[in-house]
Every structure is written in C-alpha cells, then in structure tokens.
C-alpha cells in the first residue's frame, strides 16, 4: 500500500517564484526546481509484526522487488490447510463410483421389470439411489470448488504479508524496522522515482504562449553535479496565478544512470518552437 505525492509543495513554489523575481527582465533563463518524478510512502496493507526489511536508505529498487516481509506463520498454516482440502479427490471419486453403480442398478432393474422379475417399487428404489448418488457427486464437486476458492483467499492473505516496490526508484528513508508493528503512520519506507526527473517552474505570464507541450529545453542545475541536461515540456498549466503573475510548467529529464539527484535548484532555457 502506498501514497503518492506528485505535486510541488507550496514552499517549493515560493522558492521558485522568489528566484524568478530576482532575475533581470531580459534574463533568458527561468529558475526551476528538479524533483523526483514521484515520491511514494510505502505502508503495509495489513497490520502485523515486521519480520524483515530488505533495503536500506540509498538502495536502488526495481518495481515488484520485495521490500518488507511481515511475520506470516498463521497465514502459511492456513494456506497449507486450504491447499490440502483443495487437492482432495477422494470424495469426488467415491461419489462417481456410487453414481456409476446406481446407474447400472437402474439399468438392470429396468430390464428385470420388463420380464416381471421384480416389482415396480424395486425399480423406484434403484432410481432413487441413482438420484441420491448424482446429488452426492454434485455436492462433492461444489465442496471442491469452495475449497479451491478458500485456497485463493489464503494465498491472497499470505500475499498481503509481503510488501513490494510499486516503482523503479531509490530508497529515500527507512522509518520502521524488524520487530516493530507495521502500521500506516509512519510509513515503513519512502521511495522516490528519479528516472525520469521532473522539473517544475513558474514562468512569467509573458511566456504563456511561448511554451508548448513537447518543446525542448536545457536545464542547468545550480549545484553539483552541474552540467546541462536535455528536457522536454510535459505540462503547461493554463491557469495563471494572479498573485505572482506566473503559470506552472513541468518538464521531464531522462536520468537513466541515476546520477542527477532530485531536490536541486536549477535554471531552464527553452529551445524555441515545439519539435
């Protein structure tokens, strides 16, 4: 279970707007902030004692990777019982034998009745036994189906004791440890997806019709590791913030080698028309 924070916080927006206001009017570059694409708080979908936490802060994780395992002895035992019941065939086999025997008995009784070798009530009894055998087989089949569904439920409950990563990313923080009771607050781990990174800016109103989705840009981090990074506009907010006279723009930077961290201040220069 996870919660995703995908919007720039008000404090970040304040930093960006303040930086823009200090730029000269002729400045070609707009202040920006490099952030993780998404940030995820990993919580357990069910309460339980934490048995293992497989990652540490700073570790790179893959989507679907096991992060946390809760103590699950009861769930494993329930799964074993459910599997044993679901795999039982004896009741169905017995019912099939009884049904086949009853069918043969009815056939014999029918032939004997034609020659008046038995009374009608004996045929009736044979047909009743056949009907009961068919009902018994149906009941055994339904019970097996219920056992299979119970096994599915047991498997699902056991699966809830394993928490997997919802994203490709890095571990930002580890807040709970083995021996503690897993609960929603605090989360067990915090993850961040940093490939791609998102770049948030608040551009001046004069640029509203100059920036388009798909447009290319160059992003320069203000701090280490420095350099220039190619980015592409993915969102242009069409609602203007009247207080600051700005509008929001989001870009994405590929970060396959994960060398560029999130949280850096930067400047962005747009490369003209949409490509």
Place the predicted regions along the sequence by residue.
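Bacterial N-terminal signal peptides that target proteins for export
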Residues: 1-13
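N-terminal beta-strand block that forms a small beta-sandwich/beta-barrel module immediately after a flexible targeting
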Residues: 16-49, 230, 234-235, 262, ...
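Short coil-to-beta-strand transition motifs
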Residues: 25-29, 164-166, 221-230
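Short beta-strand-turn/beta-hairpin segments enriched in glycine/proline and small hydrophobics
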Residues: 28-45, 149-166, 191, 234-240
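Surface-exposed patches in structured soluble domains
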Residues: 33, 51-54, 60-66, 157, ...
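Amphipathic alpha-helical coiled-coil/rod segments that serve as protein-protein coupling scaffolds
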Residues: 62-167, 175-178
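Structural microfeature recognizing short secondary-structure transition sites
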Residues: 173, 227-275
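Low-complexity, intrinsically disordered
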Residues: 194, 213-230, 258
């Amino acid at each position: 279970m996870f919660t995703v924070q995908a919007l720039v916080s008000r404090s970040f927006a304040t930093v960006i707007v303040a930086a823009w206001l200090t730029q000269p009017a002729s400045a070609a570059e707009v202040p920006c902030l490099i952030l993780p694409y998404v940030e995820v708080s990993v919580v357990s979908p069910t309460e339980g004692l934490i048995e293992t936490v497989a990652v540490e802060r700073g570790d790179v994780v893959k989507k679907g990777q096991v992060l946390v395992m809760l103590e699950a002895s009861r769930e494993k035992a329930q799964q074993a019982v459910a599997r044993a019941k679901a795999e039982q065939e004896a009741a169905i086999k017995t019912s099939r034998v009884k049904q086949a025997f009853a069918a043969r008995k009815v056939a014999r009784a029918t032939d004997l009745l034609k020659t008046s070798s038995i009374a009608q009530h004996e045929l009736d009894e044979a047909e009743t036994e056949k009907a009961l055998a068919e009902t018994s087989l149906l009941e055994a089949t339904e019970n097996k189906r219920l056992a299979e569904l119970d096994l599915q439920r047991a498997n699902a409950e056991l699966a809830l004791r394993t928490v997997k990563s919802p994203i490709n990313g890095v571990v930002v923080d580890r807040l709970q440890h083995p021996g503690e009771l897993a609960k929603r607050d605090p989360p067990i781990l915090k993850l961040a997806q940093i490939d791609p990174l998102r770049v948030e800016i608040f551009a001046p109103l004069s640029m509203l019709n100059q920036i388009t989705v798909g447009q290319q840009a160059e992003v320069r981090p203000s701090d280490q590791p420095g350099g220039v990074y190619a980015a592409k506009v993915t969102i242009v907010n069409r609602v203007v913030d009247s207080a600051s006279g700005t509008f929001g723009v989001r870009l994405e930077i590929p970060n396959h080698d994960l060398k560029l961290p999130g949280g850096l201040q930067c400047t962005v220069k747009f490369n003209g028309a949409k490509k």
